[in-house]
């Protein structure tokens, strides 16, 4: 796992763990821990040509690097367009709903589940 990796001032490990719990119960109920689709990977390869093979979605650490790059690109675009800060909510909703996920009402229920798990992860990190 990418320990203590930060993006936009946010520690990502608690968010990765929260998303994994919500998306797949940490891999228990899914072959793909973060539910990364081929479309997600195709989009990454459009931004960063031919870096990510489709099989990365089956590898936890490679998936985290892919998510990092996805967020690095699209969360920055969000902040630039809106002038608003990048938060865990922004990252989770972009991951769930694509480049414009933060603007989609359909990503709110997912965010609320992630937020609940994220609070647990952040509390655990304090101990």
Place the predicted regions along the sequence by residue.
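Short, functionally critical alpha-helical segments immediately adjacent to catalytic or ligand/cofactor-binding
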Residues: 11-27, 36, 67, 89-99
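A short acidic/glycine-rich loop-to-helix N-cap element
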Residues: 105-109
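Glycine-rich, phosphate-binding/catalytic loops in enzymes
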Residues: 37, 111-114
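N-terminal secretory targeting signals
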Residues: 1-14, 120-127
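Alpha-helical segment that forms one wall of the substrate-binding/catalytic cleft
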Residues: 43, 47-103, 114-121
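N-terminal targeting signals for Sec/Tat export/insertion, comprising classic cleavable signal peptides
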Residues: 25-46
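Short catalytic/ligand-binding loop motif for oxyanion handling, primarily in non-cytosolic enzymes
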Residues: 28, 103-104
